[in-house]
Curated annotation (Swiss-Prot):
Catalytic reaction equation(s): AMP + diphosphate = 5-phospho-alpha-D-ribose 1-diphosphate + adenine
Provenance organism: Methylorubrum populi (strain ATCC BAA-705 / NCIMB 13946 / BJ001)
Pfam families found in the cross-reference section: Pribosyltran (PF00156)
HAMAP family: Aden_phosphoribosyltr
Name of this protein: Adenine phosphoribosyltransferase
Protein backbone atom coordinates (compact mmCIF):
# COMPACT_ATOMS: atom_id res chain seq x y z
CA UNK A 1 0.00 0.00 0.00
CA UNK A 2 2.74 2.48 1.03
CA UNK A 3 4.83 1.75 -2.09
CA UNK A 4 1.78 2.21 -4.32
CA UNK A 5 0.93 5.49 -2.56
CA UNK A 6 4.45 6.84 -3.09
CA UNK A 7 4.44 5.69 -6.72
CA UNK A 8 1.25 7.68 -7.31
CA UNK A 9 2.84 10.68 -5.61
CA UNK A 10 5.94 10.39 -7.77
CA UNK A 11 3.73 10.36 -10.86
CA UNK A 12 2.25 13.68 -9.71
CA UNK A 13 5.63 15.48 -9.91
CA UNK A 14 6.34 17.37 -13.13
CA UNK A 15 9.92 17.12 -14.42
CA UNK A 16 11.14 20.07 -16.48
CA UNK A 17 14.41 19.49 -18.37
CA UNK A 18 17.03 22.22 -18.71
CA UNK A 19 15.50 24.47 -16.05
CA UNK A 20 16.78 26.72 -14.56
CA UNK A 21 19.81 25.98 -16.73
CA UNK A 22 20.93 23.34 -19.24
CA UNK A 23 21.61 19.92 -17.73
CA UNK A 24 19.27 20.41 -14.75
CA UNK A 25 15.95 18.57 -14.44
CA UNK A 26 13.67 20.70 -12.25
CA UNK A 27 11.32 18.64 -10.06
CA UNK A 28 8.15 20.75 -9.86
CA UNK A 29 5.85 19.94 -6.93
CA UNK A 30 3.18 22.48 -7.93
CA UNK A 31 1.39 19.69 -9.80
CA UNK A 32 1.33 17.62 -6.60
CA UNK A 33 0.08 20.62 -4.61
CA UNK A 34 -2.71 21.39 -7.06
CA UNK A 35 -4.10 17.85 -6.92
CA UNK A 36 -6.10 17.51 -3.67
CA UNK A 37 -5.58 13.74 -3.39
CA UNK A 38 -1.82 13.91 -3.98
CA UNK A 39 -1.40 16.86 -1.64
CA UNK A 40 -3.33 15.05 1.10
CA UNK A 41 -1.30 11.85 0.59
CA UNK A 42 2.00 13.71 0.74
CA UNK A 43 1.07 15.55 3.94
CA UNK A 44 -0.35 12.39 5.54
CA UNK A 45 2.85 10.51 4.68
CA UNK A 46 5.02 13.25 6.19
CA UNK A 47 2.86 13.35 9.36
CA UNK A 48 2.40 9.60 9.91
CA UNK A 49 5.67 8.76 11.75
CA UNK A 50 5.12 11.60 14.23
CA UNK A 51 1.36 11.39 14.85
CA UNK A 52 0.63 10.93 18.52
CA UNK A 53 4.11 12.03 19.56
CA UNK A 54 5.25 15.35 20.96
CA UNK A 55 6.31 17.73 18.23
CA UNK A 56 6.37 21.31 19.49
CA UNK A 57 7.17 23.07 16.23
CA UNK A 58 7.41 22.35 12.54
CA UNK A 59 9.98 24.54 10.80
CA UNK A 60 9.52 25.17 7.08
CA UNK A 61 12.15 26.47 4.69
CA UNK A 62 11.10 29.27 2.33
CA UNK A 63 9.07 28.94 0.14
CA UNK A 64 7.60 25.50 -0.58
CA UNK A 65 8.52 24.35 2.92
CA UNK A 66 5.96 26.89 4.15
CA UNK A 67 3.16 25.16 2.24
CA UNK A 68 4.08 21.65 3.31
CA UNK A 69 5.27 22.56 6.79
CA UNK A 70 2.14 24.55 7.57
CA UNK A 71 -0.06 21.61 6.61
CA UNK A 72 2.09 19.19 8.64
CA UNK A 73 2.02 21.50 11.69
CA UNK A 74 -1.76 21.76 11.44
CA UNK A 75 -2.18 17.98 11.39
CA UNK A 76 0.21 17.53 14.32
CA UNK A 77 -1.37 20.40 16.32
CA UNK A 78 2.10 21.94 16.46
CA UNK A 79 3.31 25.47 15.93
CA UNK A 80 4.87 26.54 12.64
CA UNK A 81 8.18 28.40 12.35
CA UNK A 82 9.20 30.01 9.04
CA UNK A 83 12.87 29.92 8.07
CA UNK A 84 13.37 32.76 5.62
CA UNK A 85 15.98 34.39 3.47
CA UNK A 86 17.85 37.14 5.32
CA UNK A 87 16.01 40.44 5.63
CA UNK A 88 12.47 39.04 5.36
CA UNK A 89 11.53 38.69 9.05
CA UNK A 90 10.43 41.82 10.96
CA UNK A 91 11.61 41.00 14.50
CA UNK A 92 15.03 40.25 16.00
CA UNK A 93 16.57 37.27 14.22
CA UNK A 94 19.51 34.92 14.24
CA UNK A 95 20.98 34.03 10.85
CA UNK A 96 23.57 31.82 9.23
CA UNK A 97 25.29 31.83 5.87
CA UNK A 98 25.68 28.75 3.69
CA UNK A 99 27.46 27.95 0.46
CA UNK A 100 25.78 27.91 -2.93
CA UNK A 101 27.23 26.58 -6.16
CA UNK A 102 28.52 30.11 -6.85
CA UNK A 103 28.68 32.25 -3.72
CA UNK A 104 26.74 32.22 -0.47
CA UNK A 105 23.25 32.92 0.82
CA UNK A 106 21.82 33.48 4.27
CA UNK A 107 18.72 32.30 6.12
CA UNK A 108 17.24 33.52 9.37
CA UNK A 109 14.73 32.72 12.08
CA UNK A 110 13.16 34.84 14.82
CA UNK A 111 15.16 34.51 18.04
CA UNK A 112 12.00 33.75 20.02
CA UNK A 113 10.55 31.21 17.57
CA UNK A 114 12.04 28.21 19.36
CA UNK A 115 12.28 27.53 23.07
CA UNK A 116 15.19 25.45 24.41
CA UNK A 117 14.16 21.80 24.38
CA UNK A 118 11.48 22.21 21.69
CA UNK A 119 11.10 19.08 19.60
CA UNK A 120 11.16 20.23 15.98
CA UNK A 121 10.63 18.68 12.56
CA UNK A 122 12.18 20.49 9.59
CA UNK A 123 10.15 20.34 6.35
CA UNK A 124 10.93 21.28 2.75
CA UNK A 125 9.92 20.05 -0.68
CA UNK A 126 13.28 18.75 -1.91
CA UNK A 127 16.78 17.99 -0.71
CA UNK A 128 19.67 18.23 -3.16
CA UNK A 129 23.03 19.42 -1.75
CA UNK A 130 21.61 19.88 1.73
CA UNK A 131 23.18 23.32 2.14
CA UNK A 132 19.99 25.14 3.10
CA UNK A 133 18.72 22.28 5.25
CA UNK A 134 22.05 22.00 7.08
CA UNK A 135 22.00 25.75 7.76
CA UNK A 136 18.40 25.44 9.02
CA UNK A 137 19.31 22.56 11.35
CA UNK A 138 22.23 24.61 12.70
CA UNK A 139 19.94 27.60 13.36
CA UNK A 140 17.36 25.45 15.12
CA UNK A 141 20.02 23.82 17.28
CA UNK A 142 21.57 27.21 18.04
CA UNK A 143 18.22 28.21 19.57
CA UNK A 144 18.12 25.01 21.64
CA UNK A 145 15.82 22.85 19.52
CA UNK A 146 15.98 19.09 19.43
CA UNK A 147 15.71 18.41 15.70
CA UNK A 148 13.70 15.18 15.57
CA UNK A 149 13.84 14.82 11.78
CA UNK A 150 14.19 16.58 8.47
CA UNK A 151 11.39 15.62 6.08
CA UNK A 152 11.28 16.14 2.33
CA UNK A 153 8.95 15.08 -0.44
CA UNK A 154 11.85 14.54 -2.88
CA UNK A 155 15.44 13.40 -2.43
CA UNK A 156 18.06 13.67 -5.17
CA UNK A 157 20.34 11.02 -3.60
CA UNK A 158 23.26 11.28 -6.01
CA UNK A 159 23.83 14.88 -4.88
CA UNK A 160 24.25 13.74 -1.27
CA UNK A 161 22.25 16.24 0.80
CA UNK A 162 20.32 13.66 2.79
CA UNK A 163 23.56 11.91 3.74
CA UNK A 164 25.05 15.25 4.72
CA UNK A 165 22.19 15.70 7.23
CA UNK A 166 22.55 12.12 8.49
CA UNK A 167 26.24 12.83 9.12
CA UNK A 168 25.05 15.60 11.48
CA UNK A 169 22.94 13.07 13.38
CA UNK A 170 19.65 14.12 11.80
CA UNK A 171 17.01 11.53 10.91
CA UNK A 172 16.00 12.13 7.29
CA UNK A 173 12.64 11.09 5.89
CA UNK A 174 11.81 11.41 2.19
CA UNK A 175 8.80 10.24 0.23
CA UNK A 176 10.54 9.60 -3.09
CA UNK A 177 13.84 9.73 -4.92
CA UNK A 178 14.64 10.98 -8.39
CA UNK A 179 17.83 10.09 -10.23
CA UNK A 180 19.33 12.78 -12.40
CA UNK A 181 19.30 16.45 -11.65
Amino acid sequence: MEARRHSALKDSIRSIPDYPKPGIIFRDITTLLSDPRSFRRAVDSLVHPYAGGRIDQVAGIEARGFILGGAVAHQLSSGFVPIRKKGKLPHKTVSTAYALEYGTDEIEIHVDAIKPGDRVILVDDLIATGGTATAAVNLLRQLGAEVIAACFVIDLPEIGGAQRLRDLGVTVRTLMEFEGH
